[in-house]
């Protein structure tokens, strides 16, 4: 026989951002505990609303499965004396396993005989195990910022106010944080009252009758369908925003969507000025027409039924109107001061107490950005546009609009720059230089946006590392990992052949020229090369690169990000071919032997066998062409050229012994192999491939 199990933890309102993590934890914890307790079940569901977490296990067995195990003990020679009597070791082992010494038996493992005990454990009734399982599930949940309440030491997302625990129709009796488990749940805060749950099987149905839709996926789907239906009524649609949809899903228990109107006199404002207060502050969904143009409507979702919707609609419209009135005022006031004049106001804004003002930071970014443009071989006019972009990129930080709506930084700067006639390249660069703003965000596409974005992020990373701020574990308050990943992503997409070491050094000089002291450059270079290599590895793994391919490539460093990625791409393709096997074998054999060489260059005059003389000549013959291919970054052709040496290397190993007694000849041969390693390793250290 089997019954359904339900545990509901009722709380005060929980932040929406906690919900996805708790759902995963609750599911994993319930599965783990059932497995450890040997409790079979048919299905497992987890639920969350702003006022509860719950787990429903369908078809949970009424008793544990019986358990039989064979436990290994001491070796036979230690378990029995010469007369075959059990020693203290055997007796102690038997006692620890709850069996008699006479019940021990012998089995062989890896050629050694050991004594074993066979343990049998009868399954206990499930109801006896569930009180502890329930408390373990509750205490096993973790939250970013748990809180205490009353005089309790226990911490949780928010204070727990009730606990429902049922196995079939029977209450699972236990007490936790001063609350006794029972059948009494609570419905919607204003529409529903107390709910006495009859059985776990009726949980969703009974809670819905009390205006609580406990299944978050069902709530999400309901919200999305209602939004679409309302948008269609005004000939519009809603662009899917998963983050906003998830947030709304997790702040309501009973969704009812409603359509509101935006006053026409605000529709002249830039679109982000209208949609940012909607989405970020009010959790409204903007409505667009079929071409994507913003319509004077929004959709919001009420936590309740359709009672007095007209009043709720008017209230939401009033709140948005106040927000947009503020925005319109800021927009007018900001236009009274040209963007270029705002740059000087950045002197009064501290970036970091150890790294100067934002104005100083702008100068560093400006210098670094122009340097990057020059390194990329851009003409003077383009360098000027890059420098102008960098100068104006942070000016909007002192505007009224960005002060009240920080999400609009860069967006407003681009708009204000356009108004005063800045070049399109400058306006686009200002808009794009914050990108990528989050994981999965678009990368900047304009050369001004790409260069200023890299300069901006490098300045932030070098400065932070330079004063001892580094990401640790899950802590990265300055988003340095995301910024480094942005640098890597931009360089890869743009295909820049540029030295990371040189960029770090140039950034370091900018700090020094402002009198800002950082850690020694050598220490900083080492730490940052490792840091960026980790980010490059992450990006390439996300693109499908195998870990050992990256091990091989990155063993040679990642100073030139684009080249390292190109090597990984070529190596991934070549290792799938049949000719790669003898190639890698030759490389590894040459590598292992060449490690025994003294540090002296190859002198071909010391070679005597025709095979080694021919190999040395082939190396010299290909040296110039090979160097040119490496300089150009053409690793596929460099590999093809190196492959021509494989038959000669195999002939050498078949013809001569490397480790001869003649020291001069031995060292010459080892040096020759070292030369082979340098060429064959053009794609990486192949000995690291699995």
Swiss-Prot record:
InterPro entries: DALR_anticod-bd, Gly-tRNA-synth_bsu, Gly-tRNA-synth_heterodimer. Coiled coil: none annotated. It comes from the Bacteria. One of its GO terms (cellular component) is cytosol. Keywords: Aminoacyl-tRNA synthetase, ATP-binding, Cytoplasm, Ligase, Nucleotide-binding, Protein biosynthesis. It is found in: Cytoplasm. It catalyses: tRNA(Gly) + glycine + ATP = glycyl-tRNA(Gly) + AMP + diphosphate. Its EC number is 6.1.1.14. It holds the Pfam family DALR_1. The keyword Translocase does not apply. One of its GO terms (biological process) is arginyl-tRNA aminoacylation. It is an enzyme of class 6 (ligase). GO terms for molecular function: arginine-tRNA ligase activity; ATP binding; glycine-tRNA ligase activity. Its main location: cytoplasm. NCBIfam families: glyS (TIGR00211). Belongs to the class-II aminoacyl-tRNA synthetase family. Tetramer of two alpha and two beta subunits. This is Glycine--tRNA ligase beta subunit.
């Amino acid at each position: 026989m089997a019954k359904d199990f339900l545990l509901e933890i009722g709380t005060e309102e929980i932040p929406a951002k906690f919900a996805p993590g708790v759902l995963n934890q609750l599911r994993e914890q319930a599965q783990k505990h059932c497995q450890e307790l040997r409790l079979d079940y048919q299905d497992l569901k987890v639920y969350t609303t702003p006022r509860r977490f719950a787990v429903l296990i369908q078809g949970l067995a009424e008793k544990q499965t019986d358990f039989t195990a064979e436990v290994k003990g001491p070796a036979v020679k230690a378990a029995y004396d010469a007369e075959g009597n059990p020693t203290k070791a055997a007796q102690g082992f038997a006692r620890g396993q709850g069996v008699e010494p006479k019940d021990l038996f012998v089995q062989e493992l890896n050629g050694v005989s050991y004594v074993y005990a066979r343990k049998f454990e009868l399954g206990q009734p499930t109801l006896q195990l569930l009180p502890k399982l329930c408390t373990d599930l509750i205490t096993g949940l973790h939250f970013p910022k748990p809180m205490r309440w009353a005089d309790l030491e226990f911490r949780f997302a928010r204070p727990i106010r009730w606990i429902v625990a049922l196995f079939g129709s029977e209450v699972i009796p236990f007490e936790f944080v001063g609350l006794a488990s029972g059948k009494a749940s609570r419905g919607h805060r204003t529409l529903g009252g107390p709910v006495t749950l009859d059985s776990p099987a009726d949980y969703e149905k009974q809670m819905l009758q009390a205006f609580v839709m406990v299944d978050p996926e069902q709530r999400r789907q309901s919200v999305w369908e209602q939004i679409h239906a309302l948008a269609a009524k005004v000939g519009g649609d809603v662009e899917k925003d998963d983050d906003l949809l998830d947030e709304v899903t997790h702040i309501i228990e009973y969704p009812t969507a409603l359509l509101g109107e935006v006053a026409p006199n605000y529709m002249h404002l830039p679109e982000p000025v209208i949609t940012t207060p909607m989405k970020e502050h009010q959790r409204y969904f903007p409505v667009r027409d079929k071409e994507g143009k913003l319509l004077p409507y929004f959709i919001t979702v009420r936590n309740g039924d359709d009672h007095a919707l007209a009043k709720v609609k008017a209230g939401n419209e009033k709140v948005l109107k106040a927000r947009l009135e503020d925005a319109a005022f800021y927009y007018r006031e900001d236009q009274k001061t040209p963007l270029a004049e705002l740059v000087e106001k950045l002197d009064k804004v501290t970036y970091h107490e150890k790294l100067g003002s934002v104005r100083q930071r702008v100068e560093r970014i400006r210098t670094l950005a122009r340097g990057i443009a020059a390194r990329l071989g851009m003409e003077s006019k383009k360098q000027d546009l890059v420098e102008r972009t960098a100068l104006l990129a942070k000016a909007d930080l002192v505007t009224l609009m960005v002060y009240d709506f920080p999400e609009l930084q860069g967006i407003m700067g681009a708009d204000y720059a356009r108004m005063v006639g800045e070049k399109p390249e400058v306006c686009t660069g200002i808009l794009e230089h914050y990108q990528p703003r989050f994981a999965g965000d678009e990368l900047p596409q304009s050369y001004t946006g790409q260069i200023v974005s890299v300069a901006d992020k490098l300045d932030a990373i070098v400065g932070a590392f330079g004063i001892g701020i580094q990401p640790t574990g899950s802590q990265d308050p300055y988003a340095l990992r995301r910024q480094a990943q942005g640098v890597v992503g931009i360089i890869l997409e743009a295909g820049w052949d540029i030295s990371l070491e040189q960029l770090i050094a140039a950034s370091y000089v900018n700090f020094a020229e402002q009198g800002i002291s950082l850690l020694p450059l050598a220490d900083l270079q080492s730490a940052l090369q490792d840091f960026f290599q980790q980010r490059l590895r992450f990006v390439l793994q996300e693109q499908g690169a195998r870990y050992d391919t990256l091990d091989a490539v990155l063993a040679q460093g990642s100073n030139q990000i684009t080249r390292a990625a190109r090597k990984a791409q070529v190596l991934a393709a070549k290792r799938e071919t049949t000719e790669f096997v003898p190639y890698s074998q030759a490389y590894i054999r040459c590598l292992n032997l060449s490690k025994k060489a003294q540090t002296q260059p190859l002198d071909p005059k010391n070679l005597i066998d025709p095979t080694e003389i021919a190999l040395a000549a082939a190396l010299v013959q290909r040296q110039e062409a090979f160097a040119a291919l490496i300089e150009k970054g053409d690793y596929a052709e460099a590999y093809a050229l190196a492959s021509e040496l494989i038959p000669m290397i195999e002939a050498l190993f078949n013809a001569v012994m490397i480790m001869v007694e003649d020291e001069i000849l031995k060292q010459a041969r080892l040096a020759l192999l070292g030369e082979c390693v340098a060429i064959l390793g053009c794609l990486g250290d192949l000995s690291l491939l699995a």
